[in-house]
UniProtKB/Swiss-Prot annotation:
HAMAP family: HisI (MF_01021). Homodimer. Coiled coil: none annotated. Its EC number is 3.5.4.19. Signal peptide: none annotated. Mg(2+) binds at residues 76, 78, 80. This is Phosphoribosyl-AMP cyclohydrolase. Zn(2+) binds at residues 77, 97, 104. It is an enzyme of class 3 (hydrolase). It comes from Polaromonas naphthalenivorans (strain CJ2).
Length: 129
């Protein structure tokens, strides 16, 4: 059996993916992969996702330069979620979020509202031209 056949793909042929920074353990982002994206990620050693809005593969950092070097690819106990342990490249600290922040999980629920807890490290307008 091919290693990709072990993954429990959803009815659209996708699997959810969490990118975690290998050094710090920070959760950077959530995305989706199809079979081709997961295979390319394993081959290249860089994160390649499937963009549902664009309907195509998305090599993380292709526009921004904020690539993700993949150190480990893990599959959860139900074989339906992938975890990538990555090094976020392109800025120090790494910028994983399109808002110019380190992590996409910068909003904290506190006292009945969402509060931004991470600074914008780089203006998105200067990242995506």
């Amino acid at each position: 059996m091919n290693w990709l056949d072990t993954v429990r793909w959803d009815d659209k042929g996708l699997v959810p993916v969490i990118a975690q920074e290998a050094a710090s353990g920070d959760v950077l982002m959530f995305a989706w992969m199809n079979r081709e994206a997961l295979q390319k990620t394993a081959e290249l050693g860089q994160a390649v996702y499937f963009s549902r809005s664009r309907g195509r593969l998305w090599h993380k950092g292709e526009e921004s330069g904020h690539l993700q070097t993949v150190h480990e690819i893990r599959l959860d106990c139900d074989s339906d979620v992938v975890l990538l342990k990555v090094t976020q490249l392109g800025h120090e600290p790494g910028i994983a979020c399109h808002t110019g922040r380190h992590s996409c999980f910068f909003s904290l629920y506190k006292d009945g509202q969402w509060v931004a807890t991470e600074p914008v490290l780089k203006d998105p307008a200067s990242i995506y031209k």
